[in-house]
């Protein structure tokens, strides 16, 4: 099983720590599948550094969303990669 690491801004990282955020939506520009380990590392955009805090999850399910979903990411990147929805458990 693979280990995938991604940045997460402090306001979202806090939600993860409190258990209020278990579903992750990401640009599908990387490979991930059920059973992989997904690591979110807190990234502070003000100082452009990692804070040292991280949380590891086991990926329970991955759903790739169709390219026509418009939202958080630029449309050209969604069209190119699609999006992932990952159900995570600690």
Predicted regions: what is each one?
Residues 26-29, 89-90:
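A structural micro-motif recognizing beta-strand termini
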Residues 62-90:
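Glycine- and charge-enriched low-complexity intrinsically disordered segments
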Residues 29, 43-48:
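Short, charged beta-turn/beta-strand-edge "cap" motif at the junction between a beta-strand
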Residues 48-62:
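Short beta-strand-centered aromatic/proline hotspots
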Residues 2-22:
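Short, basic/aromatic beta-hairpin or loop at an interaction surface
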């Amino acid at each position: 099983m693979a280990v995938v690491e991604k940045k997460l801004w402090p306001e979202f990282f806090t939600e993860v720590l409190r258990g209020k955020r278990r579903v992750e939506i990401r640009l599908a520009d990387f490979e991930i599948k059920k059973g992989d380990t997904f690591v979110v590392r807190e990234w502070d955009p003000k100082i452009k550094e990692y804070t040292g805090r991280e949380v590891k999850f086991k990926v329970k399910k991955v759903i790739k969303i169709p390219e026509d979903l418009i939202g958080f990411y630029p449309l050209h990147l969604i069209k190119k990669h699609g999006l992932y929805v990952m159900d995570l458990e600690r």
